[in-house]
């Protein structure tokens, strides 16, 4: 599961920001698969960690024990990102599980425009997966880049919209997948929020249409907890993923 930024955090912490305007508030890159345009504040460090259980139609399943991303604000409008996954895999035919480490992912996000009136905030995200660092069976044959345009609207103080468009290479072929995502975020209270999103991978060999929904709890301005569930309505009842996690702005 990809780790995502979500404008829901901004909605839920708007009053906190007004009360403490000099203090930055965490805008987490999880949960969800739709990134927002916000970046981490200058010289701030965040650690985001989650778990995820995924069951596929072919009987295989995986448990992501630790899906980690570390973010660092290198400039006012730019952040550096490093992440990987630690997983238990099962082929669905035997009870044995194997431990695997996903490829190291390195990237950067740039905020290029701050929302004005009905115009959205705009960001750019570029990442690549290393073919050298991680478990051998999880590594791509070549560097696997991805790039995204990120858009984010705060419609009201309790409702927001994020949407993305991007290209994703798998490191095996020269033909990328097209990534399209749309997320709706709602503030239930000042600290509790919910979201629903659709995220889709389009490829000549076949498309994948996914839906995710979940809850977020902004414990403090620097700490967020979340729960989420993914469904594939093309294979309803055969595929699902459930997970949760924490995002923490360390300094």
Feature map (PLM): residue ranges:
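Sec-dependent N-terminal signal peptides
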Residues: 4-13
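Sec/Tat signal peptide C-region and signal peptidase I cleavage site
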Residues: 15-19
């Amino acid at each position: 599961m990809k780790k995502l930024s979500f404008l829901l955090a901004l909605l839920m912490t708007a009053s906190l920001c007004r009360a403490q305007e000099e203090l930055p508030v965490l805008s987490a890159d999880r949960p969800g698969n739709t990134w927002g345009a916000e970046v981490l504040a200058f010289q701030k460090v965040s650690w985001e960690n989650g778990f995820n259980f995924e069951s596929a139609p072919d009987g295989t399943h995986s448990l992501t024990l630790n899906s980690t991303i570390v973010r660092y604000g290198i400039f006012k409008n730019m952040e550096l990102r490093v992440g990987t996954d630690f997983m238990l895999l099962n082929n669905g035919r035997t009870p044995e599980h194997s431990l695997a480490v996903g490829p190291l992912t390195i990237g950067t996000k740039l905020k290029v425009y701050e929302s004005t009136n009905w115009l959205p905030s705009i960001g750019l995200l570029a990442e690549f997966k290393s073919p050298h660092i991680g478990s051998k069976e999880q590594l791509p044959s070549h560097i696997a880049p991805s790039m995204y345009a990120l858009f984010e609207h705060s419609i009201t103080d309790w409702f927001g919209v994020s949407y993305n468009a991007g290209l994703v290479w798998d490191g095996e072929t020269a033909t990328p997948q097209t990534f399209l995502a749309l997320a709706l975020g709602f503030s239930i209270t000042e600290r509790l929020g919910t979201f629903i999103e659709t995220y889709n991978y389009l490829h000549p060999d076949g498309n994948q249409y996914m839906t995710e929904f979940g809850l977020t709890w902004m414990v403090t301005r620097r700490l967020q907890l979340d729960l989420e569930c993914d469904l594939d309505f093309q294979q309803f009842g055969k595929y699902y993923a459930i997970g949760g996690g924490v995002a923490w702005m360390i300094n």
